[in-house]
């Protein structure tokens, strides 16, 4: 744990998908052991069986109505938890006006109605997943909208990495790889900062052990058993 002035460095586990020059989603699935390959296919099929289709919008093709729809889904995620959204519609409209930012939205559709969406941002070599929401409760819709659609988009567009956001051991079984990331935090009170620094040092040792365990325990390994 390094401390410089009022800043602390905190390490944590992060899940990243890597594109090993896959030609298609089916090609990607060939890396998996048969059991987990079947599980993923079953999850995707369950969405198709419910007549859910996806429409991808990116950049300037995202009109104002689409942003309104996305925002309503984003808010629903917080309402379901009894919370208030911390971003407002003005923020999303500001994104739409920034030409240097490339948003990508995966809209889930039932018949002609949008029923959910995930918002990503496309960088030079990475797709970043950040927000999602839905106005229906449907098993596996989150995995399809937030993981599989993004993976397929990366494969089809030659994008090297997919960063779907922090947390979620369930990403491991779907092919995301764990790595160590660093965040910086400013703590002005010295006593408080020293206490946090001590905790973070101990935590980092545990994170290192956790990451090594995850690397040896993946859906590509013959010993993979995560349920």
Regions found by a protein language model. Give the residues of each.
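Short, surface-exposed, polar/charged, turn-prone segments marking secondary-structure boundaries
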Residues: 15-18, 43-45, 57, 81-85, ...
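A conserved beta-strand-loop-helix scaffold within acyl/acetyltransferase catalytic domains
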Residues: 1-140, 185-186, 218-227
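C-terminal catalytic domain of photolyase/cryptochrome flavoproteins
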Residues: 65, 78, 111, 157, ...
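Acyl-donor binding region in acyl/amide transferases
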Residues: 1-10, 124-190, 197
């Amino acid at each position: 744990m390094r401390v410089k002035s009022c800043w602390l460095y905190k390490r944590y586990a992060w899940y990243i998908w890597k594109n090993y020059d896959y030609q298609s989603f089916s090609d990607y699935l060939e890396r998996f052991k048969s059991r987990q390959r079947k599980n993923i296919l079953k999850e995707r099929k369950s969405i198709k069986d419910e007549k859910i289709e996806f429409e991808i919008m990116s950049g300037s093709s995202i009109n104002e109505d689409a942003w309104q729809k996305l925002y309503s889904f984003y808010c629903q995620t917080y309402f379901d938890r009894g919370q208030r959204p911390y971003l407002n519609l003005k923020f999303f409209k500001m994104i739409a006006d920034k030409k240097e930012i490339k948003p990508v939205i995966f809209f889930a559709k039932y018949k002609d109605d949008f029923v959910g969406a995930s918002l990503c941002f496309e960088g030079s070599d990475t797709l970043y997943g950040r927000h999602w929401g839905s106005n229906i409760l449907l098993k596996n819709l989150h995995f399809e909208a937030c993981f599989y659609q993004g993976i397929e988009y990366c494969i089809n567009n030659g994008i090297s990495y997919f960063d779907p956001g922090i947390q979620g051991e369930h990403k491991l079984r779907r092919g995301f790889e764990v790595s160590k990331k660093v965040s910086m935090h400013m703590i002005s009170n010295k006593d408080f900062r020293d206490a946090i620094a001590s905790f973070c040092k101990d935590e980092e040792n545990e994170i290192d052990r956790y990451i090594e365990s995850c690397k040896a325990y993946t859906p590509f390994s013959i010993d993979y058993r995560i349920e």
